[in-house]
């Protein structure tokens, strides 16, 4: 969870605002999970020209457009938040309060869970075992509810002990209390994102990308609206950070709205959660085994971001927020282009893996990487040449 809801992204506590760092690594990690299931050798068959090829292209175009809208709205949210709260100590407290639960969300839910769940779920669908696939999804849903619910409850109770471990000497007194209070409001996002991630993965397995693509935009809009409505009810300003409680509540509510959107969308594929938990299902173990390498990869990226903020507190109470703003600017092209291609392509790759179609899969991965590089390299060059004007324009 960057501050983005992205359950997808992403954005994120990232409720998955799609600017989150885990999305920057999803393509490579997901590909490694799938390639591990394929045998080597054999003649490479041609990629289907249609309708599958056209379907992927169409879904990619739709997802890219909706993701672009989401990024624009997310950028607007960041600009509004910067104008309201600046980069002073209280804003940095919010950044840290967001990053810690976001790290947990990306380790145990969100992209890691989806990357492991989609191949297993898709393989069952490809074999015509729809009931087993739905039972697997239901079992994982309840397991995540129990496990993440317990982690969330523990963190809320122990936040006063845990959060001070992430701050330096520049955070004192009221800033520490603010950090603890904000983290207690935000940590339930971990549970909500975990549940949303499973439901969104089911939708993506059926090539339903509209709701997953539009959810981050809805997440950002809900935050903006609630921030404008709730902020006047919290007296204070830059110095005491009291109004940041309105921001935290807005993030929590917006993340829950993402879960509701996924639940509504599942009605289109006639998916119903079952009160069923099969602890002995071997596919549960398979999903968690596949999660391990993805979790390690995403954990390194998210831990790196948190470490940057922690070291920032040793320099200044403004440093964590400034570092976070810089991170979001340089991750913007990644969120616009890479996430769209990877998200749409992954279910197709899962079906190819289930059919042991190694040749088509290699070609699809190659095409996807070429598309991403074609867009990212010019964007990176543009940001290297014009960093100061870009930052001044946005903040």
List each language-model region with its residue ranges.
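Membrane-embedded alpha-helical bundles of multi-pass transporters/translocases
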Residues: 2-395
């Amino acid at each position: 969870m960057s501050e983005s809801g992205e359950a997808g992204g992403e954005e994120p506590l990232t409720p998955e605002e799609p600017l989150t760092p885990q999305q920057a690594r999803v393509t490579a990690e997901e590909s490694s999970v799938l390639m591990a299931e394929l045998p080597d050798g054999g003649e490479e068959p041609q990629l289907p020209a249609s309708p599958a090829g056209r379907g992927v292209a169409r879904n990619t175009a739709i997802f890219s457009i909706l993701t672009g809208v989401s990024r624009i709205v997310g950028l607007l949210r960041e600009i509004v938040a910067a104008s309201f709260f600046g980069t002073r100590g209280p804003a940095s407290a919010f950044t840290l309060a967001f990053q810690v639960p976001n790290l947990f969300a990306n380790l145990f839910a969100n992209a890691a869970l989806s990357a492991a769940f989609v191949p297993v779920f898709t393989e069952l669908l490809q074999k015509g075992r729809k009931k087993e696939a739905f039972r697997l999804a239901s079992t994982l849903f309840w397991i995540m509810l129990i496990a993440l619910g317990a982690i969330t409850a523990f963190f809320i109770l122990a936040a006063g002990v845990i959060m001070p471990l992430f701050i330096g000497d520049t955070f004192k007194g009221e800033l520490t209390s603010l950090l603890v209070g904000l983290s207690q409001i935000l940590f339930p996002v971990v549970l909500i994102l975990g549940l949303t991630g499973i439901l969104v993965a089911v939708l993506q397995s059926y090539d339903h990308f509209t709701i997953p693509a539009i959810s981050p935009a809805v997440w950002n809009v809900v935050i903006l609206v609630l921030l404008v409505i709730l902020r006047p009810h919290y007296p204070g300003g830059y110095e005491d950070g009291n109004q940041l409680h309105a921001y935290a509540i807005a993030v929590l509510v917006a993340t829950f709205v993402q879960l509701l959107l996924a639940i509504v969308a599942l009605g289109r594929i006639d998916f119903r959660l079952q009160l069923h938990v099969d602890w002995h299902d071997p596919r549960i173990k398979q999903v968690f085994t596949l999660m391990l390498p993805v979790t390690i990869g995403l954990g390194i990226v998210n831990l790196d971001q948190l470490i940057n903020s922690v070291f920032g507190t040793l320099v200044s109470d403004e440093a964590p927020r400034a570092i976070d703003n810089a991170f979001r600017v340089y991750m913007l092209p990644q969120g616009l282009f890479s996430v769209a291609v990877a998200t749409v392509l992954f279910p197709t790759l899962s079906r190819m893996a289930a059919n042991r179609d190694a040749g088509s899969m290699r070609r699809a991965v190659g095409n996807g990487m070429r598309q991403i590089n074609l867009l990212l390299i010019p964007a990176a060059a543009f940001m290297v040449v014009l960093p100061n004007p870009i930052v001044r324009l946005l903040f």
